[in-house]
Structure formats: structure tokens, C-alpha cells
Amino acid sequence: MEPGELMEVDTSQELDENTSAKETDQPKDAQNDPEIVCGDSNEVKKESPSVEEDQSSTETMSNEFEVAAAILEQENEDSGQNAPSLGELLSRSVNNYHPEHYSSPPLMRKPDFRFPIINPEKAQGKLFVLYQLIITVPDSLKKFPPYTSETNCLFSENDVDFWIYKVNSVIEQAPSNALILPGFNPDTNVNFSETVGEFINRSKGFVKKPNLEQIKAVIGAVIDIKAAVEYSSMKANRPSKNKVRSKNSNSEQKRTGNFLSQVVENLMTKVDANILSRRVGKLFKNHNECTFCNIKFISFFEMCRHVGSIQLRMKINHLRYQDVHVGTWVRFLASATPQKQTIEDVIDGGSSKKVHSPEIIYID
């Protein structure tokens, strides 16, 4: 080259190397997530409304996932291990799942192709668990946005698992006095020593004979989610902060939903369906469905049997009911047993034997 001549430099190779280097320097999360976070500007790229661009973006991400799978397979071959299955690759990618990088709550996004869409049956169970956790300490969960007004959105199972983990973390870190629904507090004077049979015999002596409105209230708090939340939030069901009551007080004792269900199951073995329908059957039109289990009943007797079933028992096990609440179930179910003879029944049968009703102690 002679003096004064400019040296021609081939920069195409350098540009290719710089471009590939920039792509390699991007965060791992930004390469994997559907909404890519830019490294320097911290701005989220919005998805184009164009269908063609969405398809090309999905194909690009699929190619990246295939490349990552090929790299992992090559690494395993070099190390003498078997190649991972697709399920293992998906489970590994959960570690790269960070919803806080997205610009919208999980349920507002389009599905992530890396995670299979959850089926409706499994989603119902998981969302019910999440709902139960949310209504336990809602004040502590206001900083989390797992709520959405969209009713027709698809989501992955990992989205729900993430928020269940978040909510559980809040509950574990919260002090006991932060739980605003005392009905969900597992340490509220629960009597574990008394058996189901002992409680049934004892409650006949301290619970008033309930009217239809009281029966309606106790049924709703067991088979209706909304009524159960209202029952747990009632002022009368909250522990007093100003005065300490005796732990032996019936009004302060708490029973688990599991215990209530066992009491009902025990009583339903002796209940006559016709007597029960004649006495309280008019309440059936308002209590013909269990929103905990999403089941509709064909009769009042069938509804009561469901309360004593294992299916509902598992759903309401964490709930806490007052003694008088469970005792009300005892009183109105025991009154529908054919073994209980009244004075009128004996007279109608032509017997001259006098029957005395048991003495009932009423406690307000």
C-alpha cells in the first residue's frame, strides 16, 4: 500500500460479532419471557396487534427454546448423562419465571407457550385454595395484584402456583393478631378433647330450639362461600380485645369445619328424610347448591348428607364455628329422627304411657 491511500477494512464480520455479542449479553429472563425486558432502557416491548408479527414472535421464541434444549442435550451427552425430557426442560424453565418483570398482572397476559394451559378441573381446585388464602388476610395482600376483571382469559398453572406461594408467604410472616377473620384462626379456643358423640349429647342441653331463620343462617355458613366469609367477619364472632372471657364459655369455644361435618354425618344416619323435609324443607329453595364444591342438590336431605361428606369436609376444615353454631345443627337434625317420640305421637298410638320431654337449659 502506497502512502496516502486509505486502507479498506472489512467491517461486516465485526458487525456480525458485535450483534451476536449484544444478543448474548441480554438477561436470560429477557430472552425467555414473552414480553422482553430491554437491558438499558428498562422499557417493555409491547406486542404488535398484527397477527403475522405475533406468529413470527412465537416462532422465534420456539426456536430459542429448541436451541436451549439442544445445548442442554449436548451438555448431557458430553457428561455421559441421558438427555432430559420435555417435562424436565419445562420444570427447569420455572426457575426463570419472574412475573414481576411483566407490565401487567399474570391473569391479564397472553399464555406463555412454555407452560401448558391448566385444565378447568385443576384450575378450580387451585383457584379455590388461592381464594381461601386471599380472604384470610386481605389487608396484607393489597400490595399484590392477582386480581383481574377479565373473565375469559387463559392462564398457565405456574401463574396460579406463583400467587399461592406469594399469599402463603404473607400469611406465614403475619403476626397472629393480623388475621382479620377470626373464624379462620386455628388457635381460637378449639376444643380437641370432646368427641363427636359427647358434643351431640351436651349440645342438646345448652342450645335453644332454633327457628327457621337461625337454621337458614347456620346452613349458609357451611355450604355458601359468601355466607361463610360474612359469618367469620361478624362482630359477635370476633374475640373481645377489652375483656378476657373464660375459655370454658360456650360462646367462645370454636369448632373446626371438619368437626361440624362429622357431627352432621353422625346425625344423618338417624334422620328421616320425610320428617326433615316436612319441618325445614321450605328452606331448600335458598339452599339447593354448595358453592364450595359447585354442586346442586335435589332435596334438603341430600344437602344435609353433603355437609357430612368428606368432599365438603376437606373444603371447610380450616373454618372455625362457634359451639352454638354446631349445636344448632344438632338440634334441628335431632328433631327429625323417628326415634324421638313426642306426647302427641304416643297419644295417637293409643298408649296411656306418659312421656316427659327432656329439660332444656336455654342460654342466651
Swiss-Prot record:
GO terms, molecular function: phosphatidylinositol binding
Top-level taxon of the source organism: Eukaryota
Comp. bias regions, Acidic residues: 1-17
Segments of this protein annotated with the region Disordered: 1-61
GO biological process, one term: endosome organization
Chain intervals with Basic and acidic residues compositional bias: 19-31
One CC-aspect GO term: early endosome
The protein's name: Uncharacterized protein K11H3.4
Species annotation: Caenorhabditis elegans
Taxon lineage: Eukaryota, Metazoa, Ecdysozoa, Nematoda, Chromadorea
